[in-house]
């Protein structure tokens, strides 16, 4: 099994989404010892944002890098994304990666009945971290966007592991992380029992 692990937080070692995504990958390694993990840190190794130049693919090195990103995505059976909420949405580095994998004719296509995803059969696990609590849907453009986008690509097996309110206080941060990790442990126990 191939697993693609992406982190997008700019906070480095203090990032909750990175801690959660690492815990998710560790869980997958315990459940599936044969798993092959490919890791990409989108903050330390960002993908260039789309521009007229990158879309034209006149630079062979840029075209090869874009194809490598696409192949990592296509070959992965499980994708783990560390996705913090930045300004009600996702980091621009994660959006730049999405722009490289959401490609007509590769991961979706248009039909007479509407668009159809071509990237089905994958499992997506999102490690979501938020400084506040966003129970009001009108303030959350992060999780609905990710669900919609990956659903559009044909991925319907999507799990969210969420830590909210981490900026309220050190205690809130610890409690939110503990709750998210406890949920992850419960999911692992259920998988082992199945």
UniProtKB/Swiss-Prot annotation:
Physiological role: Quinone reductase that provides resistance to thiol-specific stress caused by electrophilic quinones. Also exhibits azoreductase activity. Catalyzes the reductive cleavage of the azo bond in aromatic azo compounds to the corresponding amines.
Co-factor binding details: Binds 1 FMN per subunit.
Presence of keyword Transmembrane: no
Keyword tags: Flavoprotein, FMN, NAD, Oxidoreductase
Residues reported to bind FMN: 9, 15-17, 85-88
Gene3D superfamilies associated with the record: 3.40.50.360
GO molecular function: electron transfer activity; FMN binding; oxidoreductase activity, acting on NAD(P)H as acceptor; oxidoreductase activity, acting on NAD(P)H, quinone or similar compound as acceptor
Assembly and binders: Homodimer.
Enzyme class: oxidoreductase
Transmembrane segments: none
Protein name per its UniProtKB record: FMN-dependent NADH:quinone oxidoreductase
EC number(s) given by UniProt: 1.6.5.-, 1.7.1.17
Catalytic reaction annotation: 2 a quinone + NADH + H(+) = 2 a 1,4-benzosemiquinone + NAD(+); N,N-dimethyl-1,4-phenylenediamine + anthranilate + 2 NAD(+) = 2-(4-dimethylaminophenyl)diazenylbenzoate + 2 NADH + 2 H(+)
Cofactors demanded by this protein: FMN
Organism expressing this protein natively: Xanthomonas oryzae pv. oryzae (strain MAFF 311018)
Record InterPro entries: Flavodoxin_fold, Flavoprotein-like_sf, FMN-dep_NADH:Q_OxRdtase_AzoR1, NADH:quinone_OxRdtase_FMN_depd
Family the UniProt entry places it in: Belongs to the azoreductase type 1 family.
Pfam families listed in its UniProt record: Flavodoxin_2
Keyword NAD recorded: yes
């Amino acid at each position: 099994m191939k697993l693609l692990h992406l982190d997008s937080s700019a906070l480095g070692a203090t990032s909750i989404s990175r801690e959660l995504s690492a815990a998710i990958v560790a869980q997958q390694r315990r459940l599936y010892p044969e798993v092959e993990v490919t890791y990409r840190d989108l903050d330390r190794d960002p993908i260039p944002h789309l521009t007229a130049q990158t879309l034209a693919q006149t630079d062979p090195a840029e075209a090869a890098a874009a194809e490598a990103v696409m192949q990592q995505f296509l070959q992965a059976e499980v994708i783990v994304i560390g996705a913090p909420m930045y300004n009600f949405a996702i980091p621009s580095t994660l959006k730049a990666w999405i722009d490289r994998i959401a490609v007509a004719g590769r991961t979706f296509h248009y039909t007479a009945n509407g668009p159809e995803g071509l990237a089905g059969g994958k499992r997506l696990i999102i490690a979501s971290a938020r400084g506040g609590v966003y129970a009001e849907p009108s303030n959350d453009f992060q999780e609905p966007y990710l669900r919609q986008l990956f659903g559009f690509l044909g991925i319907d097996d999507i799990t969210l592991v969420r830590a909210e309110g981490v900026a309220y206080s050190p205690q809130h941060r610890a409690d939110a992380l503990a709750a998210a990790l406890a949920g992850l442990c419960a999911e692992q126990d259920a998988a082992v029992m199945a």
